[in-house]
């Protein structure tokens, strides 16, 4: 049997052991905290993750850690991978097999660079450079400094930092009042990433809560107290392209064949209109760009400009046909020849814009048509010429609908024009409306939501016509429908118009012998409903197909609705 005193001794010793363990834990925790604090806060102790690499500082941000491949140096040249160029500069960059060169576009530039010779082709002109594209470890690299004119860059190389500044972005510089430590964070206890001396020039990026984020001459980015900087100077402002049209676009196509002269519109003033698109140009059966301007076309341009209308002529491919169009689209050389010819006519006739109206193309050529638009766009921007591209409704025929990549076209071109008509067209096997409101809205939403085209880049094209359908007692078509201009719609005496709420238009039918005539009416009422979509979805405006098919009240109706949408 244990003595009571022995039990007491054991009980007294247990708390002392626990106290010692607790003290040790506290001491270890304090030491760990001190070590972590020193490692994270002590000046210049921590090295950047990218300290041993070539760092890329793009528009005041070190993006090295986000690159797919390292920046490399070969023979004194700095190279950036094509994958990273695609990420930061040109999502559409690609290797053109026909010429074995990389083709890239950016803003007002289209360029190609090869793998063997030190030359760069920029907007059609070739110049000598000091490097070419290379392939290393199955990765394609481009000499980024040599590409500065393509991507509008100011390039600086300091030690292991490659500094790229977009010339279209605002830049503010300032002077250091005294010797300073540049901090990783806006905190005196943060680690130092660089040191600057009194009088050093820095790029002032942004100011917040008494601290200014800066970039040093070495390319390092960090924070200093705002009071330690002086003599702020804006060396460059943000550059934004001015829109040619203020407010909503109110446009029409002015069609005429190559066998007649351009319309004489002398003395005409069309209410609210600010853009005209005469069908001046076409691709012939040999794939050549032809113009039918002549003296009458020159007078047309003078008339339009005298009224303040911008001239965006259409280029059509209907005469070329699907095969010739395919031949052009599938050849880089032929695309560039066509683009050079378009540039020439834009300069010669002082055009304000170009409307690409290519229809009936192979679905297989969808990406090639997109390439044509991608390559045409910078050349038009270089001239200050607006690029608009016509597309049909999604989810239709392979050669009339599925041949367009509306997402790419909408991203690249200034305007995507949705030809919101021919819901039931010449090839339809049953009668129907030319452009029912519900169909127009449904397809418009597809373009905005599914194809992700910004609404303010979409011009809604309206039909100034309908079709006259004739069916037998079985409801079968007895002949191809005829096009009837809005101006020439005739409703026989005694025939009542029937309103269709979904279509937002009137419908008529009447007997013609043993057959029945059916017509869905396009008039001021139906046009008003469709134009209201501009306001509802924030669209860029409207265009009418085509001039001289409309009734006299249409321009007042369109102008009124567009004015509402502009407010």
Where are these regions (language model features)?
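Glycan-binding loop/region signatures in secreted carbohydrate-active enzymes
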Residues: 464-530, 559-567
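Short, acidic/polar
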Residues: 255-271, 330-348, 398-407, 522-535
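Conserved, mostly hydrophobic/aromatic
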Residues: 276, 356, 416, 460, ...
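Substrate-binding surface in catalytic domains of secreted glycosidases
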Residues: 286-295, 340, 363-492
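SH3/SH3-like beta-barrel fold
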Residues: 199, 211-216, 224
């Amino acid at each position: 049997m244990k003595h009571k005193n022995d039990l007491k001794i054991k009980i007294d010793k247990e708390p002392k052991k626990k106290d010692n363990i607790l003290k040790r834990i506290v001491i270890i925790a304090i030491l760990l905290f001190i070590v972590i604090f020193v490692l994270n806060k002590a000046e210049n102790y921590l090295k950047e993750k990218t300290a041993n690499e070539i760092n890329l500082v793009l528009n005041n941000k070190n993006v090295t850690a986000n690159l797919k491949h390292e920046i490399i140096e070969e023979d004194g040249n700095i190279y950036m991978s094509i994958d990273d160029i695609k990420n930061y500069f040109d999502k559409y960059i690609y290797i053109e097999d026909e010429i074995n060169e990389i083709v890239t576009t950016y803003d007002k530039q289209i360029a190609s660079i090869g793998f063997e010779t030190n030359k760069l082709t920029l907007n059609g002109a070739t110049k000598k450079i000091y490097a070419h594209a290379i392939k290393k470890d199955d990765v394609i690299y481009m000499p980024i400094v040599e590409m500065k004119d393509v991507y509008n860059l100011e390039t600086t190389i300091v030690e292991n930092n490659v500094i790229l500044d977009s010339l279209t972005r605002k830049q503010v510089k300032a002077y250091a009042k005294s010797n300073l430590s540049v901090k990783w964070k806006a905190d005196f206890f943060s680690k130092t990433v660089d040191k600057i001396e009194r009088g050093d020039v820095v790029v002032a990026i942004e100011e917040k809560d008494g601290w200014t984020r800066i970039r040093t001459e070495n390319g390092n980015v960090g924070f200093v107290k705002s009071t330690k900087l002086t003599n702020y100077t804006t060396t460059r402002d943000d550059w934004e392209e001015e829109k040619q049209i203020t407010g909503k676009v109110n446009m029409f196509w002015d069609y005429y064949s190559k066998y007649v002269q351009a319309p004489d519109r002398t003395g005409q003033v069309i209410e609210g209109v600010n853009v005209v698109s005469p069908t001046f140009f076409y691709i012939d059966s040999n794939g050549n760009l032809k113009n039918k301007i002549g003296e009458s076309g020159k007078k047309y341009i003078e008339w339009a400009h005298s009224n303040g209308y911008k001239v965006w002529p259409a280029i059509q491919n209907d005469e070329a046909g699907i095969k010739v169009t395919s031949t052009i689209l599938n050849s880089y050389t032929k695309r560039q020849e066509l683009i050079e010819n378009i540039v020439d006519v834009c300069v010669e006739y002082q055009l304000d814009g170009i409307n690409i109206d290519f229809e009936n193309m192979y679905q297989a050529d969808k990406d090639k048509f997109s390439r044509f638009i991608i390559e045409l766009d910078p050349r038009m921007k270089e001239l200050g010429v607006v690029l608009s591209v016509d597309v049909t409704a999604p989810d239709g025929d392979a050669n009339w609908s599925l041949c367009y990549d509306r997402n790419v076209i909408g991203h690249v071109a200034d305007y995507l024009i949705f030809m919101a008509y021919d819901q039931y067209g010449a090839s339809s096997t049953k009668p129907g409306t030319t452009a029912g409101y519900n169909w127009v809205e449904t397809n418009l939403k597809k373009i905005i939501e599914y194809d992700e085209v910004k609404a303010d880049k979409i011009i809604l094209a309206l039909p100034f016509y309908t079709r006259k359908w004739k069916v037998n007692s079985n409801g079968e078509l007895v002949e191809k429908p005829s096009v009837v201009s809005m101006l020439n719609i005739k409703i026989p005496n005694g025939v009542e118009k029937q309103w269709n709420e979904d279509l937002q238009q009137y419908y008529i039918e009447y007997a013609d012998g043993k057959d029945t005539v059916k017509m869905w009416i396009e008039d001021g009422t139906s046009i008003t409903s469709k134009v209201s979509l501009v306001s509802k979805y924030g669209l860029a405006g409207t265009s009418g197909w085509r001039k001289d098919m409309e009734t006299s009240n249409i321009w007042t109706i369109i102008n009124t609705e567009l004015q509402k949408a502009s407010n």
